[in-house]
A protein has these predicted regions:
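Short beta-strand->loop
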Residues: 77-88, 108, 227-239, 250
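A bilobed periplasmic-binding-protein/Venus flytrap-type ligand-binding module shared by bacterial periplasmic
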Residues: 119-124, 160-164, 242-255, 274-278
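Periplasmic-binding protein-like
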Residues: 176-186, 225-249
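Mature extracytoplasmic/periplasmic domains
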Residues: 248-313
């Protein structure tokens, strides 16, 4: 499960489930005959721990809020954007996200963006259709039929937004206490914390789960299966995120050409169209949006202006006091 059969002449890409598919790097396969080596992580904390423990990879695909932390840990190398033919077509606001350009050097290539929100069964919880709130995930009426992401950013931060933390990513002690209390209150209501989005999607499709934290792709897939789901714009605000690639300090220099080929393939218009249409995510390449019909974009929930969409919601930032929050989350899950 963890690593696909490794081939010594390809770089290793460490990424999320779903972003490893060949359709997102077709030009690389066309040029080099196969995909690179792929390893999958459930979240960035797991990825970081594995790399710290000596797992060597060439590229990782974290979200922006991790980049300053990984930079400070000394595990990133700058990326030479002049080697990327698709760089000029990347949405300009994504190129300068705080914490991703350091001392004038680019440490992150923005390729994927979207939201963390709630996917829910409109047929099973109709009272939320015109009352969209994160509060559905705390509704005792749906005890045992709710699911939450098993992660700091999409779990603990959701609780922080729900309790009204002024800045969920930099909470006061009082807000941390309230967040902990909210997670404790929620625990007996959950069917599970999900680590794999496909596990959550199956439960929603079956009606075992009525509402869950989800990314756009979960909603897009369920909707495509004809399930009566909606994707919330919660009154407290959805979370907006941007993910993309980092070049690891211990990359294999002999594979650098292939590393840049992979990045450029993922940044292409054709990869962007696939990601937009199949997953309902935004893509870094502005031209990819021009290649999808306005009707299709609307159906997928995109206002035609990517910049406007990126400016909406609560933008993920590096989490202050991360180790303490991680410990608190583990304690809550253990019933403490």
């Amino acid at each position: 499960q963890f690593t696909q059969a490794a081939s010594s002449d390809h770089p290793t890409v460490f990424t999320w489930e779903g972003w490893e598919v060949p359709e997102l790097h077709k030009a690389y396969v066309d040029k080099h005959g196969s995909s690179p080596n792929i390893a999958i992580f459930a979240d960035e904390e797991e990825a970081f721990a594995k790399m710290r423990a000596g797992f060597k990879v060439d590229l990782t695909q974290p979200c922006t809020y991790k980049v300053p932390i990984w930079y400070d840990a000394g595990i990133l190398d700058p990326i030479d954007t002049s080697r990327l033919g698709n760089w000029p077509d990347i949405i300009s606001s994504l190129k300068t996200i705080p914490g991703t350009v350091i001392n004038g050097q680019q440490y992150f290539i923005p390729t994927d963006w979207g939201q963390t929100s709630v996917v829910y069964r409109a047929d099973l919880a109709p009272e939320y259709v015109n009352n969209e709130t994160w509060g559905i995930l705390w509704d005792p009426k749906y005890r045992g039929r709710l699911a939450m992401a098993d992660s700091l950013i999409d779990g603990v931060m959701v609780a922080a937004i729900y309790i009204g933390a002024k800045n969920p990513f930099d909470m006061t002690d009082e807000e941390v206490k309230k967040t902990r209390a909210a997670l404790k209150e929620q625990l007996p209501l959950l069917r599970f914390y999900w680590g794999s989005s496909s596990e959550m999607e199956q439960a929603v499709a079956a009606g075992e789960v009525v509402a869950a934290t989800a990314w756009n792709d979960g909603y897009t897939k369920l909707k495509g299966e004809g399930i009566d789901v909606k994707y919330m714009n919660p009154k407290e605000g959805a979370m907006t995120w941007v993910c993309g690639f980092c070049l690891m300090k211990d990359h294999d220099p002999a594979k650098l050409d292939k590393i840049y080929d992979y990045l450029d393939a993922y940044m292409s218009v054709e990869s962007g169209v696939y990601e937009i249409v199949e997953y309902g995510y935004g893509h870094g390449n502005a031209k990819a949006f021009e290649a999808v019909s306005p009707g299709k974009l609307k159906e997928l929930g995109f206002s035609t202006n990517a910049e406007e969409m990126l400016a909406s919601g609560i933008f993920q930032e590096p989490i202050a006091n991360e180790p303490a929050l991680q410990t608190m989350f583990e304690e809550v899950k253990a019933g403490l």
